[in-house]
From Swiss-Prot:
Summary of the function given for this chain in its UniProt record: Usually encoded in the trnK tRNA gene intron. Probably assists in splicing its own and other chloroplast group II introns.
Pfam families, per database record: Intron_maturas2, MatK_N
Entry superkingdom: Eukaryota
Keyword Disulfide bond carried by entry: no
Record protein name field: Maturase K
Compartment annotation: Plastid, Chloroplast
MF (Gene Ontology): RNA binding
GO biological process: mRNA processing; RNA splicing; tRNA processing
GO cellular component terms, semicolon-separated: chloroplast
UniProt record similarity statement: Belongs to the intron maturase 2 family. MatK subfamily.
Taxonomic path: Eukaryota, Viridiplantae, Streptophyta, Embryophyta, Tracheophyta
Source organism of this protein record: Alisma canaliculatum
Length: 512
């Protein structure tokens, strides 16, 4: 507990008290422009074109926005007075996006400074391998084969606005910035009811992705700060890879009142969670909690999480959002793979002098990953590459492109999909995905040239679109140069291959 208090005292040093004046600096909006251009295109230029402005006038509009904000008085009014003194960008979506983007850059400052200082002090190597999504699977293969149960947790949302502001207040002590954030959230709540409607929440995330993820990560950080503390206190053996994973997936931040909460409320809880081996991984809106303990212990963790969300965040979390499965009997969805722990029975012959016997009760455990065929077909169906039963269809929206552009798009999608799911032990499903994309490409080209697929293949030959199935051959020539292609193909067909350059989930994997 003393170490936790010292850690919190150190974090308080980085609390920012003067963030609001940065909202009136032009370079803040330039930083937001550069970031959003890399993610969703330029919000300055695209919005300016929609509103009738050219590219050169975008920064003139920034100066005009700053002048208006100098004269703006941000106050929260009741619903009857909401039409008075409204947000400066309410009637202009271009101004609104600029302020959202600039404010997102400002509020990230208190979180980025401590992480940079910690990396500089500890000299953490900036290895791309640790940032790869596939780097988590070898860790799971080493640890999960010795575990018994896993809880598949869907992190509940959304959270109440005032609780969300209180969470951010522990890092940002600048009162004007907090008032401005409260004004933004309540204004958006009045316009779209983003607290109650999941569709409106997704619209908010698409329109303001950087600020949305900042708010969401702040909420998750509050939940994980207590959870990770309990996990460390309740474990006898800590994983050596735990910190490396957390440093790149966990959103930095501890709350001020964490020590008080743990002292007053959780000293009895620690006696219930004595687990020598427990692992926690979070990705997107889900998390995995695996343990070597019993089913009763996992039920206690489930009750704790439900009560914690209800008491600490003031909303009811349905128990069905947490599924407890036995690893040897059930698979769980993790980062686009179906993962399961397989039990392979072995028969061992033992011999002592002239006597021999067979021991058949020996078993080994193996962590296995396979491609989820049905969800992937659903993703291809949503993207209009096939129907719901997996029958390939044409892509009419791409028929205006050139033949080379159409082929290049299909090949790139197929290559990325094969690259991401190379860790599957059964690649029949992956070859079926390639077949769907290959035939969809042929149907799209045939639709463009107003002919049939059969006539199209007869004219171009049977070797047309062979690059869809050439990914394994390219891999063999680079990684396994000394192995013949025939035996190498069999090896790639059976072996799982993890790449260390994948830093984001494939779009077709986000089927849930």
């Amino acid at each position: 507990m003393e170490e936790l208090k010292k850690y919190l005292e150190r974090d308080r040093y980085w609390q920012q008290h003067f963030l609001y004046p940065l909202l009136f600096q032009e370079y803040i909006y330039a930083l937001a422009h550069i970031h959003n251009r890399g993610l969703n295109g330029s919000i300055f230029y695209e919005s300016g074109e929609i509103l009738g402005y050219d590219n050169k006038s975008s920064f003139i509009l920034v100066k005009r926005l700053i002048l208006r904000m100098y004269q703006q008085n941000f106050e929260i009014h009741s619903s009857n007075e909401s039409h008075k003194n409204r947000f400066v960008g309410h009637n202009n979506p271009f101004f609104s996006k600029m302020i959202w983007g600039g404010f997102a850059v400002i509020v990230e400052i208190p979180f980025s400074l401590p992480s940079l200082i910690e990396e500089k002090k500890k000299e953490i190597p900036k290895s791309q391998n640790l940032r790869s999504i596939h780097s988590x699977f070898p860790f799971l293969x080493d640890q999960f084969s010795h575990l018994n149960y896993v809880s598949d947790i869907r992190i509940p949302y959304p959270i109440h606005l005032e609780i969300l502001i209180q969470i951010i207040q522990s890092w940002i002590q600048d009162v004007p910035s907090l008032h401005l954030l409260r004004f933004f959230l309540y204004e958006y709540h009045n316009w779209n009811c983003f607290i109650t409607l999941k569709k409106s929440l997704s619209i908010f995330a698409k329109g303001n992705p950087r600020l949305f993820w900042f708010l969401y990560n702040s909420y998750v950080s509050e939940y994980e700060s207590v959870f990770c503390f309990l996990r460390k206190q309740s474990s006898y053996l800590l994983s050596t890879s735990y910190r490396n994973l957390i440093e790149r997936t966990h959103f930095y931040g501890k709350m001020e009142h964490l020590a008080v909460v743990c002292c007053n409320c959780f000293h009895k809880t620690l006696q219930l969670f004595k687990d020598p081996c427990i692992h926690y991984v979070r990705y997107q809106g889900k998390s995995i909690l695996a343990s070597k303990g019993t089913y009763l212990l996992m039920k206690k963790w489930k009750c704790y999480l439900v009560n914690f969300w209800e008491c600490h965040f003031s909303f009811w979390s349905q128990p069905y959002r947490i599924h407890i499965n036995q690893l040897s009997n059930n698979s769980f969805d993790f980062l686009g793979y179906f993962s399961i722990v397989l039990i392979n029975p072995l028969t061992v012959r033992x011999q002592m002098l002239e006597y021999s016997c067979l021991i058949d009760n020996t078993a080994t455990k193996k962590f296995d990953t396979i491609v989820p065929i049905i969800p992937l077909i659903g993703s291809l169906s949503k993207a209009k590459f096939c129907n719901v039963s997996g029958h390939p269809i044409s892509k009419p929206i791409w028929t205006d492109l050139s033949d080379s552009d159409i082929i290049d798009r299909f090949v790139r999608i197929c290559r990325n999909l094969s690259h991401y799911h190379s860790g599957s032990s059964k690649k029949q499903s992956l070859y079926r995905m390639k077949y769907i994309l290959r035939l969809s490409c042929a149907r799209t080209l045939a639709r463009k040239h107003k002919t049939t697929v059969r006539a199209f293949f007869q004219r171009l030959g049977s070797g047309f679109l062979e690059e869809f199935f050439a990914e394994e051959q390219k891999f063999l020539s680079l990684v396994l140069p000394g192995i013949p292609l025939a035996s190498g193909s069999d090896r790639v067909y059976k072996e799982r291959i993890w790449y260390l350059d994948i830093i984001r989930i494939n779009d077709l994997v986000n089927y849930s």
